[in-house]
């Protein structure tokens, strides 16, 4: 005997994560990894390419406008790091080399 369905299961709205984490280092902790710090200071374009490659994307991706912001947001999403795209934009706008160093340290620590 079959019974009619009286209530449909409800979907979940949005993304909720109870296991969110923080960045392993702050934006201005550049001296934690001196090699990354020097690279970010003197050749940030090379560091951006390395971060993109370590993230799993093409190393030429940073040549596209806005792609470093997308990679930073992707790192946050992949590792469930708290924050927002607005926060990512502010960090990259006001101290891009330090932010690139933070991204490189995060990928190094997580991989």
Curated annotation (Swiss-Prot):
InterPro entries tied to this protein: PLAC_motif_containing
Pfam family of the protein (one): PLAC8
Family: Belongs to the cornifelin family.
Protein name: Cornifelin homolog B
């Amino acid at each position: 005997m079959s019974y009619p369905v009286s209530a449909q299961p409800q979907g979940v709205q949005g993304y909720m994560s109870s296991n969110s984490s923080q960045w392993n280092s702050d934006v201005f902790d550049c001296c934690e990894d001196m090699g990354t710090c020097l690279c970010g200071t003197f050749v940030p374009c090379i560091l951006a390419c390395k971060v993109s490659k370590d993230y799993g994307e093409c190393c030429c991706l940073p040549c596209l406008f806005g792609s470093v912001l997308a990679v930073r947001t992707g790192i946050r999403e992949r590792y469930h790091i708290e924050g927002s795209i607005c926060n990512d934009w502010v960090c990259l706008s006001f101290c891009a080399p330090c932010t690139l160093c933070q991204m490189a340290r995060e990928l190094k620590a997580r991989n």
